Amino acid sequence: MTEIVADKTVEVVKNAIETADGALDLYNKYLDQVIPWQTFDETIKELSRFKQEYSQAASVLVGNIKTLLMDSQDKYFEATQTVYEWCGVATQLLAAYILLFDEYNEKKASAQKDILIKVLDDGITKLNEAQKSLLVSSQSFNNASGKLLALDSQLTNDFSEKSSYFQSQVDKIRKEAYAGAAAGVVAGPFGLIISYSIAAGVVEGKLIPELKNKLKSVQSFFTTLSNTVKQANKDIDAAKLKLTTEIAAIGEIKTETETTRFYVDYDDLMLSLLKEAANKMINTCNEYQKRHGKKTLFEVPEV
């Protein structure tokens, strides 16, 4: 009977640690890397580079899009930081949990139970906070997607050859070309006419086609960005769904852990299984913290 109770305790405790570890591992390997933020950083720089290539109306939309993308990134990394905080607490608690197996007694068993429930409880709290941040991040992406649709319509109007914006760009090119021709006029009575003729050929044959190609590349850039933002929004929604499942699983195992008797006679194999599960989660936490550029304070204890 005692052995059956011990087996049940080991199963519950091991499952509790592995469930928490699984949620963290999911965040570490999937949720936290689902958006290519380096690409988005480069994109935000490109938004500024193109600022001379669209009308004032389009410029306002671009400013809105840039703000929304930056807001989304802030909230996404806020979620990441929340999970980082859970790791900081969990590594300390699990290291203490492992050390309590030394000269095991009922008091230490009770402390282990408190520790494990604390790890699970903090996990639920922090992952729920991360979930809320991801929701806001997703909303910003969704709003940016709407602005990009409006921008595409605006750019289509701006870049139409009959639009006032397009004509203003052509007039600017012609003015600069003819001013240059006048400044470098060839000597003689027909010099200005010749220079203007050359300028006209350059404007109509080269500069205006170049303008069309440049404007086309600008619109293509924003079309690509629109597709990327839509995909990012879908990815975050999928991430939130996965995280919801993990939070529910932790909640279920926490309830079972609270009603489980911890002070039982463990054999060597049982102890090994529990220590291995705790060490694995500590390693997952360390991996997460190191990947986020901060020094890990707690390593797996020698036991």
Curated annotation (Swiss-Prot):
GO terms for biological process: hemolysis in another organism. It is found in: Secreted; Periplasm; Host cell membrane. Keywords: Cytolysis, Disulfide bond, Hemolysis, Host cell membrane, Host membrane, Membrane, Periplasm, Secreted, Toxin, Transmembrane, Transmembrane helix, Virulence. Its main location: secreted. The chain crosses the membrane at residues 183-203. It is a single-pass membrane protein. GO terms for cellular component: extracellular region; host cell plasma membrane; membrane; periplasmic space. The keyword Hydrolase does not apply. Disulfide bonds join C87-C285. Pfam families: HlyE. InterPro entries: Hemolysin_E. SUPFAM superfamilies: Bacterial hemolysins (SSF58100). Gene3D superfamilies: 1.20.1170.10. In periplasm, it forms a disulfide bond, which prevents the oligomerization. In outer membrane vesicles, the redox status prevents formation of the disulfide bond, leading to oligomerization and pore formation. One of its GO terms (molecular function) is toxin activity. Belongs to the hemolysin E family. Monomer and oligomer. In periplasm, it is present as a monomer, while in outer membrane vesicles, it oligomerizes to form a pore structure that is active. The pore is formed by a dodecamer. Toxin, which has some hemolytic activity towards mammalian cells. Acts by forming a pore-like structure upon contact with mammalian cells. This is Hemolysin E. It comes from Escherichia coli O157:H7. The lineage of its organism: Bacteria, Pseudomonadati, Pseudomonadota, Gammaproteobacteria, Enterobacterales.
